[in-house]
From Swiss-Prot:
It is a single-pass membrane protein. This is Cytochrome f. Coiled coil: none annotated. It comes from Prochlorococcus marinus subsp. pastoris (strain CCMP1986 / NIES-2087 / MED4). GO terms for molecular function: electron transfer activity; heme binding; iron ion binding. Heme binds at Y35, C55, C58, H59. The 4 large subunits of the cytochrome b6-f complex are cytochrome b6, subunit IV (17 kDa polypeptide, PetD), cytochrome f and the Rieske protein, while the 4 small subunits are PetG, PetL, PetM and PetN. The complex functions as a dimer. It comes from the Bacteria.
Length: 317
């Protein structure tokens, strides 16, 4: 009965979290696009067969992501996987409305099967302090080994601590001691492409046609319409949303593919793999016994050498 209640509470919490995310997207659709929720909705797994994490499909720019995980952990123990998302201080990007806004960050950690987010009652005071204000969510109910975070304010979350609970092969024979791989991704800033395939305003806009810029119209919301007259005398109109800065002017001669705007993007996505060893306690005991044996052997050799030296001294050798 208790387990049934726990399952009901877990499913209810998961449903409410999804409802909250959907509500935020309905109210603020453009500001929410290309964050982890969209990967959850569009991909069964956040990692493609090629090894690429799907966040890179919308966040086209590459920037480094750093991860720190312990070399080895014990069974049924809590450890920290730290994801670092570095970028220069005081950098701002353009928001969906064209205004300058602080960067936000997000991260995904794909743990091996059996590893999962540690329950809060097992968090140390240090972990509680380091994760204050950070909300963790599982990629899906079935994939509790994949943990998502974000978007979060980047200025205070350039390092995100994931409290991880390791499995115990002694109580669950599905898991084994040995080396495991983690797949980690970290992002700062908005994406360049929406999941629908259309560009955001956080990308370079280029000309689809060669010709002469006939006119540039400024729309009331701050966006532009660039009218290009091609060699046939036809007018091709390029729409540029509010945000990127124009680098062309009327009467400029341009070729197909030439940039019409600067590159406003200051963020980027990065991914990496890490390894952790689930250490068997018997192996540790064996290793300790080995070192003790080596130490005793060295002591006995020293004692034997001294004994031989005494005998040789007594015999006058």
């Amino acid at each position: 009965m208790i387990n049934f209640k726990k399952q009901i509470m877990k499913k209810t919490t998961f449903f409410l979290c999804k409802l909250l995310l959907i509500s935020s997207i309905v109210i603020f659709p453009r500001s929410s696009f290309a964050y982890p929720f969209w990967a959850q909705q569009n991909y069964e797994s956040p990692r493609e067969a090629t090894g690429k994490i799907v966040c890179a499909n919308c966040h086209l720019a590459q920037m480094p992501t750093i991860a720190e995980v312990p070399q080895s952990v014990g069974a049924d123990s809590v450890f920290k996987a730290v994801v670092k998302i570095p970028y220069k201080d005081d950098i701002k990007e353009i928001g969906a409305d064209g205004s300058a806004v602080p960067l936000q960050v997000g991260a995904v950690v794909m743990l091996p099967d059996g590893f999962k987010l540690a329950p809060q009652e097992r968090w140390t005071d240090e972990i509680k302090e380091e994760t204050e204000g950070v909300y963790f969510t599982n990629y899906s109910e079935e994939k509790d080994n994949i943990i998502l975070v974000g978007p979060l304010p980047g200025d205070t979350n350039k390092e995100i601590v994931f409290p991880v609970l390791s499995p115990n092969p002694a109580t669950n024979k599905e898991y084994h001691y040995g080396k495991y791989s983690l797949h980690i991704g970290g992002n700062r800033g908005r994406g360049q492409v929406y999941p629908t395939g259309e560009k955001s305003n956080n990308v370079i806009f280029t000309s689809s046609s060669a010709g002469t810029i006939n006119s540039i119209e400024t729309i009331e919301d701050g966006s532009y319409q660039i009218n290009i007259e091609n060699e046939n005398g036809d007018i091709v109109t390029e729409a540029v949303p509010v945000g990127p800065k124009l680098i062309v002017k009327e009467q400029d001669q341009i070729s197909a593919g030439d940039p019409l705007t600067n590159d406003p993007n200051v963020g980027g996505f990065g991914q990496l793999d890490a390894e952790v060893v689930l250490q068997s306690p018997y192996r540790i005991i064996g290793l300790i016994a080995f070192f003790i044996g080596v130490g005793l052997t060295q002591i006995l050799l020293v004692l034997k050498k001294k004994q031989v030296e005494k005998v040789q001294a007594a015999e006058g050798v």
